[in-house]
């Protein structure tokens, strides 16, 4: 029963999050830009070195998957992208424009919807 409740809650959160992302063009652009520039290292699934490194660093205290994080700030995302961190390279404005970086920032710092955010049918 608990497992079914957990699965139902996860499905609700994902569908509500998708609905809100579709309503926000900046978040959609951020998703597409993240998939193009960042997902090779920071995507979901095995074989993504950034995700693996962050999971090892945080040891379960925070998710290794950036898209699942709730603690990211716009300033932190911009800093990491423009200056690089550890083995992550920095990205120039000619690679990721300021507008694209703003979209990535909006995508990664979006918050999951609450019940009041989701429109009832």
Question: Which positions does each model-derived feature cover?
Answer:
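Positively charged n-region of N-terminal signal peptides that target proteins for export
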Residues: 1-4
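Bacterial N-terminal signal peptides
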Residues: 6-15
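Electrostatic cytochrome c docking/interface patches
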Residues: 17-35, 48-49
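The canonical Cys-X-X-Cys-His
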Residues: 30, 34-45, 104
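Gly/Gly-Pro-rich "capping" loops immediately C-terminal to redox-active cysteine motifs
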Residues: 31, 43-79
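C-terminal capping alpha-helices of c-type cytochrome domains
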Residues: 81, 92-121
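Methionine-biased hydrophobic packing positions in alpha-helices, especially
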Residues: 88-90
């Amino acid at each position: 029963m608990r497992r079914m409740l957990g699965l139902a809650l996860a499905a609700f959160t994902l569908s509500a999050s998708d609905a809100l992302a579709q309503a926000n063009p900046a978040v959609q652009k951020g998703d597409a830009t993240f998939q193009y520039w960042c997902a090779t290292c920071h995507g979901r699934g095995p074989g993504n070195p950034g995700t693996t490194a962050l999971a090892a660093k945080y040891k379960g205290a925070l998710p290794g998957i950036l898209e699942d994080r709730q603690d990211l700030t716009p300033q932190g995302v911009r800093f990491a992208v423009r200056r690089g961190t550890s083995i992550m390279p920095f990205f120039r404005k000619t690679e990721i424009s300021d507008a694209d970086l703003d979209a990535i920032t909006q995508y990664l710092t979006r918050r999951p919807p609450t019940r009041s955010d989701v429109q009832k049918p």
